[in-house]
Amino acid sequence: MAGRSGDSDEELIRTVRLIKLLYQSNPPPNPEGTRQARRNRRRRWRERQRQIHSISERILGTYLGRSAEPVPLQLPPLERLTLDCNEDCGTSGTQGVGSPQILVESPTVLESGTKE
């Protein structure tokens, strides 16, 4: 990895191998048995996967020195947001359904109070 010493590369590889081992220790559930038994096994498996994911995030966060809280996403002001449907409107199978979207006007135009 560029800009890192070889020692920390080996430590990162060891960390990634540990996380890989955690995920490999929880194989997908057996598809045999009654519907209820399969459902319970899948539910328990998903819970273990969530726990492994949480542990993996904590291990990597500690190793990389990142904060546990995500950085807040900076959004533009609402006045600048528009809905435009000129290209790629909708997903496949829904194109042409409903009325076309229109551009949202700024609040100053909407609040002018003049009648046309």
Curated annotation (Swiss-Prot):
Its main location: host cell. Keywords: AIDS, Host cytoplasm, Host nucleus, Host-virus interaction, Methylation, mRNA transport, Phosphoprotein, RNA-binding, Transport. InterPro entries: REV_protein (IPR000625). A motif (Nuclear export signal and binding to XPO1) lies at residues 73-84. Residues 36-47 have a biased composition (Basic residues). One of its GO terms (molecular function) is identical protein binding. The modification Phosphoserine is found at residues 5, 8, 92, 99. Gene3D superfamilies: 6.10.140.630. It is found in: Host nucleus, Host nucleolus; Host cytoplasm. Residues 18-26 are annotated as: Homomultimerization. Residues 21-49, 92-116 are annotated as: Disordered. A motif (Nuclear localization signal and RNA-binding (RRE)) lies at residues 34-50. GO terms for cellular component: host cell cytoplasm; host cell nucleolus. GO terms for biological process: mRNA transport; viral process. Belongs to the HIV-1 REV protein family. Escorts unspliced or incompletely spliced viral pre-mRNAs (late transcripts) out of the nucleus of infected cells. These pre-mRNAs carry a recognition sequence called Rev responsive element (RRE) located in the env gene, that is not present in fully spliced viral mRNAs (early transcripts). This function is essential since most viral proteins are translated from unspliced or partially spliced pre-mRNAs which cannot exit the nucleus by the pathway used by fully processed cellular mRNAs. Rev itself is translated from a fully spliced mRNA that readily exits the nucleus. The RNA-binding motif binds to the RRE, a 240 bp stem-and-loop structure present in incompletely spliced viral pre-mRNAs. This region also contains the NLS which mediates nuclear localization via KPNB1 binding and, when the N-terminal sequence is present, nucleolar targeting. These overlapping functions prevent Rev bound to RRE from undesirable return to the nucleus. When Rev binds the RRE, the NLS becomes masked while the NES remains accessible. The leucine-rich NES mediates binding to human XPO1. This is Protein Rev. The lineage of its organism: Viruses, Riboviria, Pararnavirae, Artverviricota, Revtraviricetes.
